[in-house]
Amino acid sequence: MEKRAVVLYSGGLDSTTCLAMAKADGFAPYAMSFSYGQRHGFELEVAKANARPLGAVEHLVVDFDLRRMGGSALTDDISVPKEGVGSDIPVTYVPARNTIFLSFALGWAEVLGAFDIYIGVNSLDYSGYPDCRPEFVSAFEALANLATKSGVEGQGHFSIRTPLINMTKAEIIKAGVALGVDYSWTHSCYDPESDGTSCGRCDSCRLRLKGFAEAGLVDPLTYSGR
């Protein structure tokens, strides 16, 4: 039987790198994306177009609407900050988003008989999100093995794999390039133009551009703000 893993895949730089890493680790990757009412929906279109070409065995898109709860510039009519990356938890934080995403991934993993879940969280070049920290990942992994039939019956041990967690954005990009990732097939912007062109000024764009610059590489995307 193939060794399966669920990969949380948004269409962004980090999750695309994770998908390549899961393949390199010998897993058959099953990609999971989310349509949760995000304003930056172009990223999801990128994910839909590229999951299979990038090597996903299946690509499951889960639909739910976090706009009904509110609380984030990524789902509400709140301006996305363009003044630079700060140290506080930003308004682009989506309440409990990674907990929600990982819960869906855990359910699918149990159905698939997969005990490995990849998520591209990063605790170095990140924007202050509490659900990108190692402490959060460890806590969710413990929960996964307590809250599932497979875990309780000892069929296997669920592992939340975070290969990017201690890497800078430049290191992530270099690792992806070494694995053959084409970053023109990714999208990172929180506030793109209607045609999908990245703004070049939001936190996500700034971190991406900084990563490419520090890696000594040219970002293949075009930006409206530059």
UniProtKB/Swiss-Prot annotation:
The lineage of its organism: Bacteria, Pseudomonadati, Thermodesulfobacteriota, Desulfuromonadia, Desulfuromonadales. NCBIfam families: 7-cyano-7-deazaguanine synthase QueC. Belongs to the QueC family. Keywords: ATP-binding, Ligase, Metal-binding, Nucleotide-binding, Queuosine biosynthesis, Zinc. ATP binds at residues 9-19. The keyword Methyltransferase does not apply. It catalyses: 7-carboxy-7-deazaguanine + NH4(+) + ATP = 7-cyano-7-deazaguanine + ADP + phosphate + H2O + H(+). Its EC number is 6.3.4.20. GO terms for molecular function: ATP binding; ligase activity, forming carbon-nitrogen bonds; zinc ion binding. Transmembrane segments: none annotated. Catalyzes the ATP-dependent conversion of 7-carboxy-7-deazaguanine (CDG) to 7-cyano-7-deazaguanine (preQ(0)). This is 7-cyano-7-deazaguanine synthase. Pathway: Purine metabolism; 7-cyano-7-deazaguanine biosynthesis. GO terms for biological process: queuosine biosynthetic process. InterPro entries: QueC (IPR018317), Rossmann-like_a/b/a_fold (IPR014729). Its cofactor is Zn(2+). It comes from the Bacteria. Zn(2+) binds at residues 189, 199, 202, 205.
